[in-house]
């Protein structure tokens, strides 16, 4: 069984009720943080997961709303890990990830120096291990595998999605993307697909062109549902709602998705959990 927790379902616009885009996937004793939107560690703490308890951080792409809290994750995982010789924290992302991680650690350079000077048991900077992928196997440990495939969020490139499998169950995390063959293939037959969604029918009515621009590189609710249908997934889990879902509007979003997908549809707020079991 895999467990999905929507840690943050918000957008780049700060929302008092929604953290930035981030999803936690738990597979037995392993915990994977997919993207690091603002507020993610507080949301993770609410479900009993600390930064030092993460098995790996998976980044779908390097847009600011998806990596806003990366620095906090890196530093907090370091200062709250009390093992004598802690293993490096794996960061898995697209090309460019190593550069972003290096720059993030440099930005926190003074803080890192202060802590090393103050604590006798902190003698080196945060141990980080970066792996960059555009496609193929990315993880195989203790019965959990992760595979990567390219997505389409152009002009943001490259961007990737992840397929996590354990004990016969599978979850695909699409990240930000328009429909594309590579995502269909990655998600084929998966038990669950976590997909970011926007309401293009609403966004196109907003007067500012900069806001309307997001329509050409994100999937609408119906497009995400159509991807789920083509791929033959069991459950569609929607997240990263743009605009934010208002109180009592969840069924509107679910009904839109149901026009394209007849399977289980999950629409949830932050901390919404979905258990994923292998389909028989």
Swiss-Prot record:
EC number(s) on file: 3.1.26.11
Residues at which Zn(2+) 2 binds: 65-66, 176, 240
The keyword Phosphoprotein is assigned to this record: no
Positions contributing to Zn(2+) 1 binding: 61, 63, 153, 176
The keyword Transcription regulation is assigned to this record: no
Stored CDD domains: arylsulfatase_AtsA-like_MBL-fold
Reactions performed catalytically: Endonucleolytic cleavage of RNA, removing extra 3' nucleotides from tRNA precursor, generating 3' termini of tRNAs. A 3'-hydroxy group is left at the tRNA terminus and a 5'-phosphoryl group is left at the trailer molecule
Broad enzyme group: hydrolase
Essential cofactor(s): Zn(2+)
Pfam family, one: Lactamase_B_2
Active site per UniProt: 65 (proton acceptor)
Cofactor: how and how many bound: Binds 2 Zn(2+) ions.
GO molecular function, one term: 3'-tRNA processing endoribonuclease activity
Keywords: Endonuclease, Hydrolase, Metal-binding, Nuclease, tRNA processing, Zinc
InterPro entries named in the record: AtsA-like_MBL-fold (IPR044094), Metallo-B-lactamas (IPR001279), RibonucZ/Hydroxyglut_hydro (IPR036866), RNase_Z/BN (IPR013471)
SUPFAM superfamilies per the UniProt record, alphabetical: Metallo-hydrolase/oxidoreductase (SSF56281)
Subunit structure: Homodimer.
Summary of the function given for this chain in its UniProt record: Zinc phosphodiesterase, which displays some tRNA 3'-processing endonuclease activity. Probably involved in tRNA maturation, by removing a 3'-trailer from precursor tRNA.
UniProt similarity note: Belongs to the RNase Z family.
The protein's name: Ribonuclease Z
Species for this entry: Mycobacterium bovis (strain BCG / Pasteur 1173P2)
Gene: rnz
